[in-house]
Amino acid sequence: MSISTSTLGYPRIGKNREVKKALESFWQQKISADELLKIVREIEEASWQTQTKAGIERIGIGDATLYDQILDWSFRFGIIPKRFQQFQNLECYFAMARGKDGILALEMTKWFDTNYHYLVPEITPDITPKADFSDFLETVKRAKKIIGKSAVPIIISPITFIRLSRLESVEFDNILAQLLPLYSDLLTKLKKLGISEIQLHEPALVFGDSSNLKKQFEMAYAELAKVGLNIHLVTYFDDLGETYPWVMKLPVTSISLDLTRGQNLELIKSYGFPADKTLGAGVVDARNIWRIRTQEVTSLLEELKGIIPNISVQPSASLQFVPYDVRREVKLPEALRNVLSFAEQKLEETVLLSKALTGKSNKSEIENIEIYWQEFYKFSPANEKVKSQIKALKETDFRRSMSYLERLDNQIKLPAFPTTTIGSFPQTKQVRKLRARYKKGELTQAEYLAQIDANIAYCIGLQEGMGMDVLVHGEFERSDMVEYFGEQLDGYTFTTHGWVQSYGSRYVRPPIIFGDIYRPHAMTIREFEVAQSLTEKPVKGMLTGPVTMLNWSYPRTDISRQEQAFQLALAIREELKDLEKAGAAFIQVDEPAMREGLPLKQQRWHEYLNWAVDAFRLSTAIARPETQVHTHMCYSEFGDIMESIKQLDADVISIEDSRSNNETLMQLTDADYPAQVGPGVYDVHSPSIPTTEYLRESLYKCIQYLPVTQIWVNPDCGLKTRRWEEAIPATRNMVQAAISLRQE
């Protein structure tokens, strides 16, 4: 019998967002590459020491990144598309991430069903993988020096890497054959450094179609096993499904399973677990922020102990999806804080559970956790009115009063290629400082609102001057599209230091749903009315949809996600009604996170999509026929959920298509999407400024797929992260491109 502890990755942004600040300073040429790397390494080394101090025995290392871990492996393998090969070193790396001088960046998409985004490798016939592992080997050497034998290198497996790549005129098997010798070479070098075990992260195994690659998995692992290192095969986010029986036979020494999601426990009971392997028992949920329920988890571990002799207790995945330390959240009510668990607390829970399994735990620690939960349930807000409203919902509450074509006749007529933006305009340091000063009490409400209104006036004047057709107020009062609404809803709370990485230098603070959700007052009406009073042109009301609010929050675990989504939908529904009363003829209900909530296995999609679509419709069905309802979705693959997208019954959908080579546009066309579409004609995540000619070409491509009457012209996402000197010429060129096409 062997009981141990492991980790599979750790937050890498710095407790005070040091990496973000360093990246932005480097991009602005305020610090050197050496200074940037020094800061990132200090954060990385601090995380190793934190895990060591907590008592973790085998610590996953090598997951720290300047931007994205998949981009790192693309770079190490020399999988660099031709358009970036003119650049060298970090200039090339960041050009791939962000674009440069008009060159499109790599496509960005969701990391499985999380809110993290990775950069999609592009593998084309002209690319021959050629490895340079020097940075990774340097990391391993540092880790060995600091934490010794506890260091276990984390490597993205070749099959997951290829599975997540875009293959253009190349065969999966051919690329695998080219990559495997490079992987074997890396493992050989690690062995020479004295490494005895590696983690090979294989999340692609949880996809429902992974059995189609059974031969490739078996061949790859047989080849890598020849090196003679202990291979710890790591899966997460779902169960192995039908792959379980043959995965258990792969030549590895450990297999990690996520026991917080899916049916892995049932698979173990049905098929057993090989006695010659260690089970990495992912029992501490790496993706939520709630403390363990000790009785449930210890019972699960005791059950596993009766089946499997060698167990490593660990988080279910990398801890990059949770903040660092809940003890810093001194503003949260104690009853709530006591049942929250961030990365450092999850390390403590991992060690506590390991001790409980060996009979060495402190009984009072376990009892205290249960007492905390009892106190929390007394504190958590309940709203009987909301519960009653949900019980009383009727079919008509989910349906607009007219069909799309009937509504179209009632709505404001606009010129061909109508122009708009997705909502936000640049959030400068001055704007962020303004909100911070107001929160600290350094400004009165009147002083704060006067400055917000000045920003709105500037934004409206700017758009009018460009000739934009449907304006937005700019969202200067909003630090985040979820946080802004959550702060005004009962049942939500927010952290002060709870930052997690969304992509690159973009960090977010997901709110926490801890009780029933209710809208006590209007949330967006004042700013809308200010903006609309400044122009004769229509201004869009801007709301975040219920499914995105849910998927970008840490949800409750005591009631279903569906019920939480419906509570949110009722709140958004009331806000939409108030926007109409204030004169809004265009209202956007953003759902960028609709697809990311999908279960990873397709057979479970139907249930999720049913209630997700219903939640959106519940929030928008109350709109009058003359109100044009827009929605926005980004970083999503729509082809396989197109019927659900159509069922949303939005009048206009704007999408992220600028990095996707018109794939999403083709999918909409193939599905005979009936409503209007804003394809997203340029990439806002790149600092490059698109020319009018480039944007004209983008629109010409759109015309190949959609009739002119269906096309809107907009950027692919909000402009919040751009600077004014980037946003102004880009949007002006966009409007000019649309106007020039009208004149043809």
UniProtKB/Swiss-Prot annotation:
It holds the Pfam family Meth_synt_1. Its EC number is 2.1.1.14. Binds 1 zinc ion per subunit. Zn(2+) binds at H632, C634, E656, C717. The active site is at H685. One of its GO terms (molecular function) is 5-methyltetrahydropteroyltriglutamate-homocysteine S-methyltransferase activity. Keywords: Amino-acid biosynthesis, Metal-binding, Methionine biosynthesis, Methyltransferase, Repeat, Transferase, Zinc. It catalyses: 5-methyltetrahydropteroyltri-L-glutamate + L-homocysteine = tetrahydropteroyltri-L-glutamate + L-methionine. It comes from the Bacteria. It is an enzyme of class 2 (transferase). Its cofactor is Zn(2+). 5-methyltetrahydropteroyltri-L-glutamate binds at R17, E18, V19, K20, K110, W552, E596. Gene3D superfamilies: 3.20.20.210. Pathway: Amino-acid biosynthesis; L-methionine biosynthesis via de novo pathway; L-methionine from L-homocysteine (MetE route): step 1/1. L-homocysteine binds at I422, G423, S424, E475, D590. Catalyzes the transfer of a methyl group from 5-methyltetrahydrofolate to homocysteine resulting in methionine formation. PANTHER family: 5-METHYLTETRAHYDROPTEROYLTRIGLUTAMATE--HOMOCYSTEINE METHYLTRANSFERASE. This is 5-methyltetrahydropteroyltriglutamate--homocysteine methyltransferase.
